[in-house]
């Protein structure tokens, strides 16, 4: 049975259920398993497997203490009736993004209830967490999910956990630094167990504060007297990360079925990412046997990952830019820690030292040997705001296909980076429906943008012949239920107050 431990220590190994329930390790590290890759997902027969079967295979390989019937139930509950496309994450073919002629495909990850890729994992995580109850007499313990969001995680987590028994959720978002649609998705969320709060600061401020909340032993002791423990719905929780591995295999299976590739062909994935979780799932897929030639990191103007992969120095001491791709406006990429662990061959002392330097000094520099190993797997590129707008227009002009600003970062990077030799296809992960960012998309197409985002949606619909998802268009008529805004140092009190209302 696979066990999980912190990226910063081999002590106190846990089962996957325990790791999911806790969310983050007591020393601040993230949970990893040294058995990653010991089980391989067979490529033979992959083309015949639908998404639900693939999900059962991948989850069984990574969450080994869940019984097969538990995994089957989680998969059924998460995906059978909650996604608008039968493929769950369908693949669309575009014209080659680069002059090298290698086919380009888009993996649409936004057909879930909140129109963002986070739905794939956050429809699954509550089901996994519901089956982590202990048998040691503490089964009545309640869980308070605490999550910082740069835009999409918040609504997807709220939708997944709303009214879940024995669970509450507190979501923090940076006030004024998410799109109007994203903010309304959160502030109109219904549910007796949900709490939403804006924070005065950026996402990194909020995410750092959440980690400090998890490390606050006095707070944990006070909550324990109420029968409450804290956990996370961010991708720092391994139960959030693992479900994302599935759609890499699903994309490959669809290309096999369409005849675009043959079994064993290598493919590239380009991933718009800020917190490194989505692309880390691709690395997990590679370790599980998927023929991944290269994983390409696409960043926006907050290009800390580009600089890191280019120079080997991670430096968060830099200007923060508010862009049209708010879910990538991040300067501290939490999931990078897991990648460092695996590519340093499990060197917990090195990882602990680097993370300490990042916290205390704001930067760290990798050993040359480790940087070389990382570059064998990961490439990188980035797009500024003008390049993002041009990419949205180019994709529409060349393909009649709308993309959001996050996806546009990846489209730009692919168009300026030839495929690695031997790669038979390039797959761009599309992380959000373009109607979540109607103003940016309409502006990029040169359309008139009314002051109201919902009027922008209508302009976009008329000009392109596409339709806004119903769940987004209806937001303008929903009452705002959450109006709290706090300073960063008020977040812990907000969580404690929300936990006091759990039933």
Tell what function each PLM region has.
Residues 1-503:
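PLP-dependent amino-acid enzyme catalytic core
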């Amino acid at each position: 049975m696979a066990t999980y431990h912190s990226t910063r220590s081999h002590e106190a190994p846990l089962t996957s259920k325990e790791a999911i329930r806790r969310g983050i390790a007591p020393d601040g590290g993230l949970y990893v398993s040294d058995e990653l890759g010991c089980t391989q997902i067979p490529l033979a027969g992959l083309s015949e497997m639908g998404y639900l079967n693939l999900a059962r295979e991948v989850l069984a390989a990574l969450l080994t203490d869940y019984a097969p019937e538990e995994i089957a139930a989680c998969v059924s509950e998460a995906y059978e009736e909650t996604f608008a496309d039968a493929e769950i994450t369908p693949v669309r073919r575009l014209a080659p993004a680069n002059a090298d002629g290698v086919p380009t495909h888009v993996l649409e990850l936004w057909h879930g209830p909140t129109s963002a890729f986070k739905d794939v994992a956050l429809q699954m995580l509550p089901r996994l967490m519901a089956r982590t109850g202990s048998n040691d007499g503490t089964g009545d313990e309640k869980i308070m999910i605490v999550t910082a969001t740069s835009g999409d995680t918040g609504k997807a987590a709220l939708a997944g956990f709303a009214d879940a028994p024995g669970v509450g959720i507190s979501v923090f978002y940076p006030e004024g630094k998410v799109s109007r649609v994203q903010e309304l998705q959160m502030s109109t969320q219904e549910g007796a167990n949900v709490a939403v709060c804006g924070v005065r600061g950026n996402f990194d401020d909020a995410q750092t504060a959440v980690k400090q909340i998890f490390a606050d032993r006095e707070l944990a002791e006070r909550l324990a007297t109420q029968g409450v423990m804290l956990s996370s719905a961010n991708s720092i929780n391994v139960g959030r990360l693992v479900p994302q591995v599935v759609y890499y295999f699903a994309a490959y299976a669809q290309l096999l079925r369409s005849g675009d590739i043959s079994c064993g062909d290598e493919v590239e994935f380009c991933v718009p990412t800020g917190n490194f979780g989505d692309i880390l799932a691709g690395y997990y897929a590679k370790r599980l046997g998927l023929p991944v030639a290269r994983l390409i990191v696409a960043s926006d103007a907050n290009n800390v990952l580009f600089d890191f992969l280019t120079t080997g120095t991670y430096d968060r001491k830099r200007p923060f830019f508010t862009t049209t791709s708010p879910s990538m406006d991040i300067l501290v990429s939490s999931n990078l820690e897991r990648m460092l662990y695996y590519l340093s061959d499990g060197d917990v002392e090195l990882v602990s030292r680097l993370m300490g330097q990042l916290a205390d000094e704001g930067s760290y520099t990798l050993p040359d040997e480790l940087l070389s190993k990382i570059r064998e797997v990961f490439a990188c590129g980035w797009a500024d705001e003008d390049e993002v707008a041009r990419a949205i227009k180019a994709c529409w002009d060349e393909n009649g296909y709308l993309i959001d600003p996050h996806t546009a970062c990846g489209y730009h990077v692919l168009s300026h980076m030839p495929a690695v030799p031997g790669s038979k296809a390039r797959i761009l992960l599309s992380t959000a429906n373009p109607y979540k960012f109607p103003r940016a998309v309409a502006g990029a197409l040169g359309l008139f943008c009314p002051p109201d985002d919902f009027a922008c949606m209508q302009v976009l619909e008329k000009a392109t012949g596409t339709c806004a998802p119903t769940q987004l268009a209806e937001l303008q008529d929903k009452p705002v239920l959450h109006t709290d805004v706090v300073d960063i140092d008020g977040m812990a009190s907000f969580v404690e107050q929300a936990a006091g209302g759990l039933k």
